[in-house]
Structure formats: structure tokens, C-alpha cells
Amino acid sequence: MDIDVLEFVDKIASIESAGDTLDRLPQLISLACEKGQETQVYERLNELASKSAIRVEQLSAENNQDFSKSVNQLSVVRSELRSLQSLMADLNTDIQASGRDLQNMKQQLNSLSTSERFLTKYHNLVRSCMQVLHQVQYSQELLSKKQYLPTLRICSEISEVHLKRLDGLGMYSTIQQYIVTTKEAICSAVMEDLHEWLFSIRQKLPLVGKSCSQQIDEARRRWAREYKEDLVNLSSKTSISLELYLLEMMDFSPLDNEIVKISFEPLYICLQVHSYLGLLSSFRSSFERDRRRQQEFLAPKSLTTLDMAVVSEWLNSIAGFMIVEYYILQCIPNFRSYEEVQNIWTIICEKLVETILSVAFTEQSTTTIIKLKNQIVLLMHTMERFGFSVESLRNLCVELIDAFGGALILKHSVFFEEAFEKDVYAPMIVETQEEYDHYIAPYWNFPSEPFPRTMSFSKMCPLCCTTLSKFVRHFFMFLNDSVILATEVNEKAPRFYRRFILRSLVDRLKSLYPKLALSQMSQLVKNFYAFEDPLLQIEKSLVLNKPIHQIGAEASSSNNVKSTELLEGLANARKSALHEIFVKINLKIDDFLGLAEYDWTTTQVRKDVSGYLQEMVTYLQTMYLESLAGLPKHDKSYVYLETLDHLCTAMVDLLSDPSIRKVTTAAAEGFKLDVEYLESFAAQVPDQSIVNADSFIELRQCANLLLGDNMEEYLDTDKFMRDFNRLQPAVAIKFLERHINNYSANPLSNDRPKRRAIEILIATLKKR
């Protein structure tokens, strides 16, 4: 039992005033009910009442009066006590009812307290959810405005701060999935924006390259105007001075100017997003693949001819593409490596070189090739300005020199054809000094003579020399002001010059041989001689690196510079022309021999020379004395010997014809007469007439063998070396086998000794 409640009961019991006791009684009841000690209090009160009754009895016994008084008081007390008990019973009933209500209220209070805690918790959760939802909504607003990085920061804040409060809720996984989806959406969006940006700059690449190339070209032209005095000085300038000039004078922003503006903001945003998400490495790889794919689209789908509109746009796109790469490399550290950019540049150059070379050598327009070269040189200067290696482009320009040379040869070959067609293949007659100065003086230096003057060559020669001079001048037009190619152009000029002469001039003239007459062929030989000096002068000017307009007197006064290849080409052309001349003459000789009608079985000695020989000799005299007039002595001698040797061989073959079964002495006498006639003609031909007459020694020895009295002389070594040294044993056997039939095999015949001698000679020759 709680001491405080009992003390309170005792304190009430000690109060003498009944009113005060009653005033304290509710407080006691409330305290007892609060402590749950109603029974104990009730028992304590009964105990106090009993004690009071006992004391009263004691007091009554001691003092009756007092007792009576006390009885009365006791009665009053009892009455009050009964009232009090009744009141306490009522109070107890009320207290019990109040206790039950209080218990219910306490239970309700506990329930309310629990509910309040849950409400507070749920309130906090709802507030957290609302904060998250607010952040989600805000992130969506930012995302709709393409503010990707702030959106990612909000997603990170949700994930790292707010989302922990939602752990265990179904909303947790939803928000978590939203964050993942949002990050993926942002990645997809920035990549889509990046691809759109790449596509947009792909459309602008030609403008970027063109604008920058124009600035480079203007700077290059300023340099050329400042430094170019003449072709010699230009050729001696190094390309280093031009490069330094471009580096110093070039002040131009290729990506931010009046023509084109390109912002790297989409790339920066994409880079920041992937860096924030820790995906920078994969983004770098993806960007590298995208740029490689884009460089593949720079080249035209097909290029079968040099369409300069297509090529120019391609080259400008290449320049623009690499300029963008350069600025990405410079403006975004540690994103693109120098090796990656150089690798792409190498691939682009390889594709460019392969494609251009596949069509350049089929291009016939020299103007187009020069335009192409100028575009590539401009691309070289542009790329050098941004630090890219241009060696492959320079090599491409060197290859274009060959393509240009081939096209130039094809172009100027037409002028050769015109000169060949218009030429009369006769000595050129110069009527006036003006004509001489125009056609002759630039290429030949002849002593002064009165006009009209007859040249040894035909008009073809000065026309061809003029074409060659134009060819050389036009060849150096490839150089223009491209000093970086001066050395290669100077080196290749003599080579293409010789190729032009040997292939377009010499070989084309050779193809005309079958169509030309003998007099025309003779004139052509003289033309080849006339070509030698001017062609070597022009070549010398190229070898000595002299300007073309100084070909004349200065070149001829210098030390003689000869090209073995050129001289051999002209010499071979002359030889082939001379060969064609004697081939034509030999064919005519064969035609005359086809008219020969020898009666090898005749017994009548012929007194006159065969008619076909007389006609043939007349033809040969005309050819030798007229058609071959003007040729050098050694060339004429060459033709004489070749044609006369052919005539001798043909007549030997005529006598060796298998259809001839018998050759009589009379027929041999007639044949010898023809041989003597030919020897007489050969002796009268000028220039080495003795040598010419020797061409018929074999024929004379054949006739002497057939008409010889003593056949054994052929077997005498001394006699053979003197009279039959040109006669082959096989040929002698053929003649003797035909001649033996002229003698009878009858032992009693007078011809028997002669026949026997021939038989012995034939048998001896066959044993050799």
C-alpha cells in the first residue's frame, strides 16, 4: 500500500472539522482512484472508524456524561458516518465508473498517441514523397528544356538524398527506375543532338573548307605578288617562305565568320553528360566511330571523270572536316588524341589519292588537270596551316604532273597531225624575211641569202618545232605559282619533251611510211636531220632550266648538250625511213623481175639486154638521181647497196627456181649479158660506184661458172678465191645440176667429157 495515500487518509482523519473532512474527501477519492487503491482506502477509513468507536466507548465508560454527550455526538457521527458511507458508496460507485471511463480514456489516449506517431510518420513520408515528386517534376521541366546537366544533378540528389527516405515503399523502385530511365533518355537525347549537330556541320563542311581556302589563297596570292619577279626567281623560291608567310598573315576563324558559324555546344554538353555519368571512355569510342563513318561519306559515291564541281566540293569538305577535327583537338583536351586525328587524315588522303589517280590519267583536258592541281595545292596549304602532314598530297600533285604531261601530249599531237596532213613533203620555199623570221629564225641559224630561199626541209619542220615550243611553255603552265612543285616540273619537263617527240612526232611519222611515196620518204629523212638541232636546243633549255623564250641564240651559243635518247630516236627514225625506202624500191624490183621471161633451153644466143631490165634500170636511175637527191652521201650509199644487193639476190633466186630443169649455154650467155648490163649501171651510179658494182659479183661468178671451159678450176683453191669466192657451194650445185642437162650422157658424144667434169664437180661439192 502506498504510504502517501495512507498518510493522506490519516491527515483527513486528524481533521476535526467535519466540513473540512468532507472537503478533503473528494481529493482522497481522486487520489485513491488515480492510484487504484480504492479498497485499501475504504478499509483504512473503516479501521479509523472502528478506532474512533472504541475510543468513544472508552471515553463513555470514563465519563458517562461525556459518554452521553459523546453518544449523541457519536450518533451524530454515526449519522454523518452513514451519510459519509453512503456518500462514499456513491463516490465509490462514481469512482469505479470514473475509473472505468478513465481506463477507456487512457486506452483511447494510448491509441491516439499511436495514431499520432503513425500520422507523423506518414506525414513525413508524404512530405518526402512530395519533395521527390516535386524534384521529379522539376527534372522533367529541365529535361523538356534540354537542360541535361541540371537534370542529372537533380536525379543524383533524388538518388543520394531523398530516395533513402522512401526505402520500403513501392514508390522507391518506381523512382529508382525513373532515374535510370531519365539517365538513359538524357544519354539518348544528347547523342541524338550530337548526331544532328554532326549532320548539320557535315552540310557546312564545304563552306568551312571553301571560306578557309579562300583566305589561304588570298594570302598565297599576296605572297606571290610580293615575291614573284619572273619564272626563274619563282622556281628558286623555297616553299618554306610561303609556309611562314601563311602562318604569319593568316588571321581568320574558319568556324566563326560571316559565311559560316559552328558552335561546339552540343559536343560540350554530350561530353559533360557522359563525363558526369562516368561513360566518357565509351563516348570517346563512339565519337571516334562516328567521325570515321562521316569521313567515309566525304568522298563522292562514284567518280569516273574529273568533274571539278564534284571534286571541288569534295576537297572543300575534306578541308572543313579536318579543320573541325583540329578545333576539337585543340578546344577539348584529352578527348581526341593526335594519333586518332592523324589516322583519319591518313585514311582520307589515301582515298583521295586512289580516287583522283584512277581518273586523272584518263582526263584529256589539261585545263581541268591544272584546276585540279590548284585545288589540291590549296588544300595542302590549308592543311599545313593547321599542322597536318601533306606529303601524300604533294606526291599526288607530282603524279598529276604525269597526267598533265600525258594530256598535253595528246592535245598537241593534233597539231602534228595537221602539219603532217598539210605538208607537201617537198623543200620549203621561204619568200620573205618576215616568213623567215617567223618560221626559220627561232629554230635554225643559216647564213644570209637572198629571197626566195629553198630550205632542205619541208614546212612540216618549223610547224612541228613551233608545236614543241608551245608544248614546253604549256607544260610549265602546270607550275603556275605552285613553287612547291618547281623542282619536279623542271625534272619532268625534259622527260615529257622527249616522250612527246619520240611517241607523237617520230612514231606517228613512222606510221605514215606505208602511205608515202619514195620522194616523200626521202624528204622525210631530210626532215629528220633538220629536226635535230632545234629539238636539241629546246631540250638544252630545259636541262639548263632556262626560260623557253631564251631558246634561240643563247641556247645555240652554249656548250652542246645532247640527249642520247633523243638522238637515238631520231637516228632510228631515219634508219627506219631509209629501210622503208629500199623496201619500196625492192618491191618495185620484184615487180620488174616478175616480168622476166628467160628461155633457159634456147640454143640461140641473145644479143640484146632483157627488156624488163632496161625498164627497171630506168626506174632505178630516176629513183637514185631524183627521189634520193639531197640525202647525205652515206644514206644514199646505204640505199644503193641495199637495193642492188636485193636485185642480185633476187636474180640468183630467179636462176635457182626449181621449175628450171635445164640451162643451155646460149641461155647462160644471155644471162651473162644482163649481168654485165647491171654492172655497167651500178658503176655509173654516183657515190661509191665501185662498191655498187661489186653487188653483182655473185651473179657474174654464176655466169662464169656456167660458161667455164674447165670445171675443175672451181676446185682449185687459188682459182676459187680469185674467181668464185662469192659463190656458195649449195648455189653452185643447183646451177650445175641444171646446166649438166645441157650435155649428153652418151659415152660416144662429144659432150661426154664436159658432162663428166660437171658430174665430178657436183659430187665433190656435195661431199664438202
UniProtKB/Swiss-Prot annotation:
Coiled coil stretches, renumbered: 69-115
Keywords, in A-Z order: Coiled coil, Exocytosis, Protein transport, Transport
Matching Pfam families: EXOC6_Sec15_N (PF20651), Sec15_C (PF04091)
A biological process from GO: exocytosis
GO cellular component: exocyst
The keyword Repressor appears for this protein: no
Gene3D superfamilies with a match to the protein in the record: Dsl1p vesicle tethering complex, Tip20p subunit, domain D (1.20.58.670), Exocyst complex subunit Sec15 C-terminal domain, N-terminal subdomain (1.10.357.30)
PANTHER family linked: EXOCYST COMPLEX COMPONENT 6, SEC15
Role, per record: Component of the exocyst complex involved in the docking of exocytic vesicles with fusion sites on the plasma membrane.
Quaternary structure, from the entry: The exocyst complex is composed of sec3, sec5, sec6, sec8, sec10, sec15, exo70 and exo84. Interacts with sec4.
Family from the record: Belongs to the SEC15 family.
Name of the protein in question: Exocyst complex component sec15
